[in-house]
Amino acid sequence: MTGHRPAGGRHAAAPGRAGRRIASSPMGKLPLRARLATTIGGAAGRMSRLAGRGDGSVIGGVIGLRVEPDLLALLAAGRRVVLVTGTNGKTTTTRLITAALGELGQEVASNAFGANMEAGLTAALGQAPDAPLAVLETDEKYLPTVLAATRARVVVLLNLSRDQMDRAAEIWMVARRWREALASAANCTVVANADDPLIAWAAAAAPDVIWVAVGQRWHEDSWCCPQCGSHLSRDELGWRCGECEFTRPPARWVLDGSSVIDSAGRVHEVSLSLPGQANRSNAVIALAVSEVFGVEPAQALARLRDVASVAGRYTQVERHGRQVRLLLAKNPAGWLEAFDVLDEPPVPVLLSVNAREPDGRDTSWLWDVDYRVLRGRPVFVTGERRLDLAVRLEADQVPFELVEGVDDAVDQVSGGRLDVIANYTAFQQIRVALGRAE
């Protein structure tokens, strides 16, 4: 590991498709074809929003890339780009980093609503053509491609666990592709979670790494050493392989309960509006990234406290005289994190699960979640795969009631509050039902 460099200007030309070189004149004029692609894509996004068919954060990029296949690289040229990836926490961490970098007083381009493949990233940059900074949530599968196109200044690696296994590759294959891409990422600083063995293995190949210790609640996908395949052991000092030299790297930032020890050894209280320990972990990552850009931790923390919801997550909505709080959980690790921030029993909870393309068709992951923590409170179940979830709750002896939708659950709550946990498309459906809660 080497010491990180202050975030400065961009490096030389980035490679486009088929070997084409992309000039990196900061904020310079785009080529005519790229300007045309951006204009057409922007118009398509606006039409999508006016037609009520979403926020336009994907369609504009899809059309723009059809007109100019190198549009992502062209729009990224001249900017200092941060890429954020991992199984869980991408959208929230992206939002927190964007908030912290606001301290610099410069416009920051970002895909705030989580459209995290090439089209969504392209649309986000096209909507902020003059922003010198960009913070982009990036789908795990697309990180190598996006890194090559954007020549990112910082890459954030949060965590890796099973997620949508019928869509994405096995997580070890994902980690290997990251490792290969990062090994040749010149002038890039990687901010990585030292407590996740797969993340540590992927990041270790990078020339410049800032290790951050923010914990790992879900261990089920990382009992084997990614270096040699032997068993990993864990104790209060971290994890290590008993067969090879692979061990948890020493961290420069350490989350300890509700406090963080920064790279200079100073202690800060991590006080947030967002609930839960997982969001403290996300916040510490944001602090480490913002320091790369010259933002002091105390200044960044003040901005992080102002973030109260993220693309509908953690939003509270009044519905029929009750307070409804929305929580997103897409996989076993995410459901455990959501359980951690539930109000104490007997506050009721509504669980909603779909299995559409963005969710992954395979619902067998439901059996990897321990639902016994929900005993002692009213539990309502809805969603297109509510029967799959019902069978799982029966197995854990958790009493529940099947309902048609969020309003049915709200109407059965005597008063006060209802927590809602839903996977991706179910979450979006509930947001729409509640008036597109932000």
Residue ranges and their predicted role:
Residues 120, 145-146, 166-167, 200-203, ...:
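Short glycine-/acidic-enriched loop or helix-start segments at secondary-structure transitions
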Residues 4, 8-11, 15-58, 77, ...:
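ATP-dependent carboxylate-amine ligase
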Residues 71-99, 271-273, 289-292, 301, ...:
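A short, flexible N-terminal coil/short beta segment enriched in small residues
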Residues 134, 154-160, 208-215, 349-351, ...:
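Short hydrophobic/aromatic-enriched beta-strand-loop microsegments
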Residues 79, 157, 161-322:
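Acidic, Mg2+-coordinating active-site environments of NTP-dependent enzymes
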Residues 87, 112-113, 137-139, 159-160, ...:
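Fold-independent oxyanion-binding glycine-rich loops
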Residues 97, 101, 121-125, 283-293, ...:
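Buried hydrophobic packing segments
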